[in-house]
């Protein structure tokens, strides 16, 4: 037992030396966690877009249609920049970026409302920036609800024996849960922070592994800086090295970045710490499993580009997981960041407890076990292959 612990300690210390002596690996574990969160947060720093300019094409020209336009202008989401003579004029203004949306009120708008029939209006939005589209749709939905309530109130008050004081429509109030600012950054950055940590250390592990292979090619299949121990001690020592290296970046990502940019932190800090333990272990063993497939240092950057977009999609940030088919859900389940993103959203943004996120928490521990077994098997296989000097004709 003492011998195994000594071997683990030797591998652990040696892996530190390999990481700190590799400029590429240091860039990945320092620059990526330090710079990327700030870059992404600054992109979404404004959080909420207000007063999006729109033009109104009013072919009805009645008090009700004018009231509808005034109600739109009164919302915080949009402002009526001007009235257009017709749709052609409105499209020209959108093309010239004088406005980012068009609201079209047909000539029968007020008549249909007065008859109690379904009234029709049309909206055209610029989709180049999703925040503008969201604001325009939100403003129109809000005004439609308010105007519909006023119409219903007017009908009730015209009854033969109306209730005293009139009848008010059902009041509604929008109460944001978790994401109080309703900002895009507060919605997606907490999940992206977890993905950044994973990518940084996957690339660090791959970079160190590729450097080791290059040393073997230069020395007839022998890595002169490798500690000769068993596969178990090698695996545990390497994993402990990368897990301990993750601690400071994780504190920075999950504590200081949200403070700097006022992202929501409604969860218990101890629940976040408990969540980080299986996540760091899963990322370490996941990286030690994948390191075999990166054989050259030059291949690390393509891996960064390809896997970052792929893992981002599978995590549910850009597309909800329930809308994916079974195959992609299964693939996403194999990625540690997928479960961590879901859990950190619930804990930090919504104030959930770790017990309420037990599915993601248990899934991370399952991945720890799975990737430990797989990485151990891969390491044993690779060690067996290296018993004979590796000769690369290339």
Predicted regions and their residues:
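Alpha-helical membrane-protein architecture signal
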Residues: 5, 9-13, 186, 227-240, ...
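Hydrophobic core positions of alpha-helical segments in small-molecule transporters
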Residues: 28-29, 190, 236-237, 300-303
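Membrane-spanning alpha-helical segments of multipass transporters and channels
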Residues: 39, 61, 92, 244, ...
């Amino acid at each position: 037992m003492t011998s195994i612990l000594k071997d683990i300690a030797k591998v652990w210390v040696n892996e530190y030396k390999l990481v700190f002596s590799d400029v590429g690996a240091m860039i990945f574990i320092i620059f990526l966690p330090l710079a990327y969160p700030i870059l992404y947060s600054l992109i979404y720093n404004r959080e909420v877009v207000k007063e999006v300019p729109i033009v109104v094409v009013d072919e009805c020209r009645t008090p009700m249609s004018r009231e509808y336009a005034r109600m739109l202008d009164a919302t915080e989401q949009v402002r009526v920049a001007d009235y257009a003579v017709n749709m052609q004029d409105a499209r020209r203004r959108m093309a010239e970026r004088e406005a980012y949306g068009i609201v079209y009120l047909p000539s029968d708008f007020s008549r249909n409302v007065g008859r109690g029939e379904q009234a029709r209006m049309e909206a055209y939005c610029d989709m180049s920036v999703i925040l503008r589209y969201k604001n325009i749709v939100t403003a129109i939905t809000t005004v439609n609800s308010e105007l519909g309530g006023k119409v219903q109130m007017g009908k009730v008050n015209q009854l033969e024996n109306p209730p005293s004081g009139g009848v008010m429509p059902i009041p509604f109030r929008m109460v944001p849960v978790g994401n109080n600012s309703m900002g895009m950054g507060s919605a997606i950055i907490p999940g992206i922070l977890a993905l950044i940590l994973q990518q940084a250390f996957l690339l660090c592990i791959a970079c160190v592994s590729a450097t080791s292979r290059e040393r073997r090619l230069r020395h007839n299949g022998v890595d002169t800086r490798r500690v000769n121990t068993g596969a178990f001690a090698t695996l545990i020592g390497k994993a402990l090295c990368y897990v301990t290296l993750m601690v400071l970046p994780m504190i920075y990502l999950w504590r200081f970045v949200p403070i700097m940019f006022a992202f929501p932190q409604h969860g218990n800090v101890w629940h976040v710490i408990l969540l980080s333990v299986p996540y760091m272990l899963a990322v370490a063993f996941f990286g030690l499993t994948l390191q075999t497939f990166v054989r050259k240092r030059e291949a690390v950057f393509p891996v960064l580009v390809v896997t970052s977009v792929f893992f981002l999609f599978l995590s549910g940030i850009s597309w909800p997981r329930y809308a994916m088919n079974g195959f992609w859900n299964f693939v996403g389940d194999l990625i540690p960041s997928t479960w961590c993103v879901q859990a950190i959203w619930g804990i930090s943004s919504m104030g959930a407890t770790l017990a309420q996120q037990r599915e993601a928490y248990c899934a991370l521990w399952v991945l720890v076990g799975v990737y430990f077994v797989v990485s151990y098997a891969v390491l044993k296989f690779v060690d067996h292959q290296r018993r004979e000097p590796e000769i690369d004709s290339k």
